[in-house]
Amino acid sequence: MAALDGLPPLRDVIQRHGLDARKALGQNFLLDLNLTQKVARTAGALEETTVFEVGPGPGGLTRAILALGAKKVIAVERDARCLPALAEIADHYPGRLEVIEGDALKTDFEALAPEGPVKIIANLPYNVGTQLLVNWLLPKAWPPFWQSLTLMFQKEVGERIVAGEDDDHYGRLGVLCGWRTDARMAFDVPPQAFTPPPKVTSTVVHLLPRENPVQCAVANLEKVTQAAFGQRRKMLRQSLKPLGGESLLVKAGIDPARRAETLSVEEFCLLANNL
């Protein structure tokens, strides 16, 4: 990659700017530029596309996205120590990298989105990754402002994202992702690819928005999944008691003796629509 974009190796960048990944910020820097290119390629063609990135750190993934031809990258970085390293990348790619210093959880990405196609590609900080994904899945207007999400998570979170019914990993996150997206795990990334190495394997997940998801009120779906999976080993007649229990299930045509992990996304939407 250094040969491709003419920028110095990431290890040199980190040493020169005194960057150490901080646990409090959920940081693990991905330094293998072959891997950052693999992540960026998972998002598909990037020409004429604006890419949002969260937590770019020293900019390894940022460089890969730009080298693969993205029209522009808008990167949200909370750690001010990383800004000088990102400024060097911005100088190398004039007009194509905008860095916003701030908290991604408080950032209105839709308001920042320009006209034209938008993709989100990120090695998400572990401590905010799941909440960011949920935020991107919950807008009332659908299809959303983004064309795809290509995101790195701890593998256990990735398994929850893609899980369907009768899977041990199936839960509220799997229902939400299955309702509004077609999600797949693309590839795993071993701990030694990062600095410092996390204790767990990571995985890259690629999500595409469903054009016509089942009509369902988000707030009701949240209530139903929270109650059902909050007591996942109990029969639904018991776990859904606060929401109507057996009468709700009968109205939706669902056997009250079933358990949460056996319900499809469509059946959860049916329950939500009968609340």
Swiss-Prot record:
UniProt family annotation: Belongs to the class I-like SAM-binding methyltransferase superfamily. rRNA adenine N(6)-methyltransferase family. RsmA subfamily.
Enzyme class: transferase
Role according to the record: Specifically dimethylates two adjacent adenosines (A1518 and A1519) in the loop of a conserved hairpin near the 3'-end of 16S rRNA in the 30S particle. May play a critical role in biogenesis of 30S subunits.
Primary localization class, coarse: cytoplasm
Catalytic reaction list: adenosine(1518)/adenosine(1519) in 16S rRNA + 4 S-adenosyl-L-methionine = N(6)-dimethyladenosine(1518)/N(6)-dimethyladenosine(1519) in 16S rRNA + 4 S-adenosyl-L-homocysteine + 4 H(+)
Protein name per UniProt: Ribosomal RNA small subunit methyltransferase A
Binding sites annotated in the UniProt record for S-adenosyl-L-methionine: N28, L30, G55, E77, D103, N123
GO molecular function: 16S rRNA (adenine(1518)-N(6)/adenine(1519)-N(6))-dimethyltransferase activity; RNA binding
InterPro entries, A to Z: KsgA/Erm, rRNA_Ade_diMease-like_C, rRNA_Ade_Mease_Trfase_CS, rRNA_Ade_methylase_Trfase_N, rRNA_adenine_dimethylase, SAM-dependent_MTases_sf
Gene3D superfamilies membership: Ribosomal RNA adenine dimethylase-like, domain 2, Vaccinia Virus protein VP39
Keywords of the record: Cytoplasm, Methyltransferase, RNA-binding, rRNA processing, S-adenosyl-L-methionine, Transferase
Gene Ontology cellular-component terms listed: cytosol
Taxonomic placement: Bacteria, Pseudomonadati, Pseudomonadota, Alphaproteobacteria, Hyphomicrobiales
